[in-house]
């Protein structure tokens, strides 16, 4: 939880340092959509970044990159490149589309939408829903991984050998159990957060 709060604080700092900022909720059309609030609900189109920070976040906005940090996060818009999300519960809705990679760190992650490249997830629980479409791989560090029998995962599913896994035999994908290097069963969130920190520094 401390690591998640640290990443959330960095998101907020970056938002404060960028000049084109919108402190409100509603529909927007701008180079960047950037919102800090307790409750965030956005629609519209950004020609650049979508950066949202709050307690409860609902993003139906479209943009090039998504940077989202909150407690409850729901994404139903279209991200044309990569999405970086930190939260307690993160849901990619059925209408949500990530056209490149999804990086997510949360206690619970639910994917019902489309990811057109890879998913990098660090979470206590990951659910790939019945409407999910993942064109690339799933790289997971999680205690529990569930893939619905009607989900589409075209790449490789990678998880720790200690993970509690439910993957239907009919799923057309490769499944790889990665050997655990340490002896703890704690979820390691360092890898995904490292990716988030790296992008923010750049």
Predicted regions and their residues:
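Intrinsically disordered, low-complexity terminal regions
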Residues: 1-202
């Amino acid at each position: 939880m401390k690591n998640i709060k640290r990443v959330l604080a960095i998101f907020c700092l970056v938002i404060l340092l960028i000049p084109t900022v919108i402190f409100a909720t509603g529909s927007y059309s701008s180079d960047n959509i950037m919102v800090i609030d307790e409750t965030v609900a956005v629609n519209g189109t950004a020609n650049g970044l979508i950066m949202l920070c709050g307690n409860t976040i609902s993003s139906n906005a479209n943009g090039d990159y998504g940077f989202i940090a909150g407690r409850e996060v729901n994404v139903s818009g279209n991200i044309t490149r990569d999405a970086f999300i930190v939260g307690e519960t993160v849901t990619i809705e059925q209408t949500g589309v990530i056209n490149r990679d999804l990086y997510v760190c949360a206690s619970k992650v639910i994917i019902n939408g489309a990811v057109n490249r890879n998913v990098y997830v660090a979470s206590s629980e990951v659910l790939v829903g019945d409407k999910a479409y993942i064109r690339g791989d799933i790289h997971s560090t999680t205690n529990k991984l569930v893939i619905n029998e009607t989900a589409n995962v075209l790449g490789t599913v990678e998880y720790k050998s200690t993970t509690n896994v439910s993957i239907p035999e009919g799923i057309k994908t490769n499944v790889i159990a990665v050997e655990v290097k340490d002896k703890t069963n704690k979820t390691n969130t360092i890898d995904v957060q490292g990716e988030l920190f790296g992008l923010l520094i750049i």
